[in-house]
């Protein structure tokens, strides 16, 4: 016998936070600190190595990844976009 229960899912929209940089690029770990997404460089290193960060939709484990205008980093249901 099939179970006919209905399940409701509530999908939380991700908050988009825009950050302006004045240089050609910024390293991923420094960008996370600039956005206050992490508390320290050590914390940034851990979350990046653990695969918790997506850059432009792809998991990124490169702490020194260079981000430029238009790039997006995603962490804990927030999207940080470089403008």
Region annotations inferred by a language model:
Residues 1-35, 59-83:
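Ferredoxin-like alpha/beta domains used as RNA- or RNAP-binding modules
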Residues 24, 46, 53:
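Residues that recognize and position ribonucleotide moieties
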Residues 34-47:
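Short beta-strand/loop turn elements enriched in aromatics
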Residues 47-48, 67:
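Short, well-ordered loop/turn sites that connect or cap secondary structure elements
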Residues 50-58:
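Short, structured beta-strand/loop micro-motifs enriched in basic residues and often containing a Trp
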């Amino acid at each position: 016998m099939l179970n006919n229960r209905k399940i409701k899912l509530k999908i939380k929209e991700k908050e988009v936070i825009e950050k302006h940089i004045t240089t050609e690029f910024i390293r991923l770990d420094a960008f996370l600190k600039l956005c206050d997404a992490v508390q320290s460089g050590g914390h940034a290193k851990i979350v990046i190595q653990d695969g918790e960060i997506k850059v432009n939709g792809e998991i990124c484990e490169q702490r020194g990844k260079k981000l430029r205008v238009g790039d997006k980093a995603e962490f804990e249901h927030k999207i940080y976009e470089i403008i």
